[in-house]
Amino acid sequence: MVAGRIDGVCVRGIVGCVPEGRETVDDLARRFGEDAARKVAAATGIEERRIVAPGQCTSDLAEAAARRLLDGLGWDPASLDLLVLVTQTHDQVLPGTASLLHRRLGLRKGAAVLDITHGCSGFIYGLWTAAGLLRAAGRRALLLVGDTTSRLVDPDDRAVAPLFGDGAAAVALEQDEFAAPIAFDLGSDGAGAPYLAAESGAMRHPGRPARLFMDGTQVFAFTLREVPGSVRAALDAAGWTMESVDHLVLHQANAQMIRHLGQKLGAPAGRTVVALREVGNTSSASIPLALAGALAPSLNTASRRLLLSGFGVGWSWGSAALVVGPLALCETVVLPGRKCPAETAAPASPTS
């Protein structure tokens, strides 16, 4: 377990991005039958998911979110010292997707970039990494998270096809000596690696088709075993009580699990956020998409105490307690399905 606090770093804005394409319960009913599709929707709280168009990749969603955020804040891309990208669905083997986005967004030549391969815990790991690096050196950072998990899903697999959607988000971070500390708790257990995996591609299984496998029973047991303790550790590191938290935002895996964890943690009524009905489980992007969607009216107008927790593949988990708002920009944008992949378009010119 890694627990601690990072001082002097503030969240300035959050923009989520989802693709235009949708798959609804009605679409699933045509594939799996009406009763099966409705039962899954009732159990998970997912009625539709956003799906990327052919040719669209994680970087396209992340770029759209980043451009809107930088424009809304009035930040010159050349003012960024750091870009951290979290995804488990990279555009290609190498170079890393963060390097591709460095070029496309027009960051200055000396800016540092970093790829982190993490799934549902990835937003917390990315926030911890970006805030820590920014505190050590630099003034401004851009944290990008996103996944196109639909590309890994067998459309005929009833265990995973109704759950996963695609999405990304961009978060602007800036040094601020008056910012409240961000408290973290993180952990991993590699014994869980076989239970949520896509054993394909890369070097070990280069010819195997990319297919996501999930043992739902093991995932649920892991979540109940590790997440409550992590959330409480972050609370303790912040010096908060659960009653003092304005919003509890857990990884948006399914509605039943979220509500169960909220009750187990003793969250006051109405403070546990459930925001996956129209997007599904968007992996690393699920927490910031909830912030940029369901909580946008709250975060745009006032300062809020947020308690966040992500958990999943690895096993890995992470929780954070932080004060956010009022934000200069907090919203969600849609990437049109007709938009060409950005790598085929004219690149932005990096500044020196």
What is the meaning of each model-derived region?
Residues 46-48, 79-84, 103-117, 150-156, ...:
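Glycine/charged-rich beta-loop-alpha catalytic/anionic-binding loops adjacent to active sites
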Residues 12-15, 86, 117, 141-147, ...:
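Short beta-strand segments
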Residues 65-81, 229-246, 294-299:
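Phosphate/pyrophosphate-binding loops at sites that engage ATP/ADP/AMP, CoA/4′-phosphopantetheine
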Residues 59, 63-66, 89-90, 108-110, ...:
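Claisen-condensing/thiolase-fold acyl-transfer catalytic domains that form or cleave C-C bonds
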Residues 1-54, 157-221, 225, 229, ...:
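Condensing-enzyme catalytic core mediating Claisen C-C bond formation in acyl metabolism
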Residues 33-42, 92-107, 143-149, 198-203, ...:
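Acidic-glycine-rich active-site phosphate/pyrophosphate-binding loop
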Residues 131, 135-167:
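Flexible, glycine-rich active-site loops centered on histidine and acidic residues
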